[in-house]
């Protein structure tokens, strides 16, 4: 489990409002780190308040280990 510590600048710009809100809601909360992709980005998995499953890819500097 990791914490998303910040949202990369411009990351939300082209996303639907409901996806933007879901990502804002997990900021600073524990989410599942699935793996790192070939580009070195962390694949995060989480469910929003409605139970919708989301995946997002961020550079490692935007996450920390959750204890």
Feature names for model-found ranges:
Residues 1-67:
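Basic/aromatic-rich interaction segments and small domains that mediate binding to polyanionic partners
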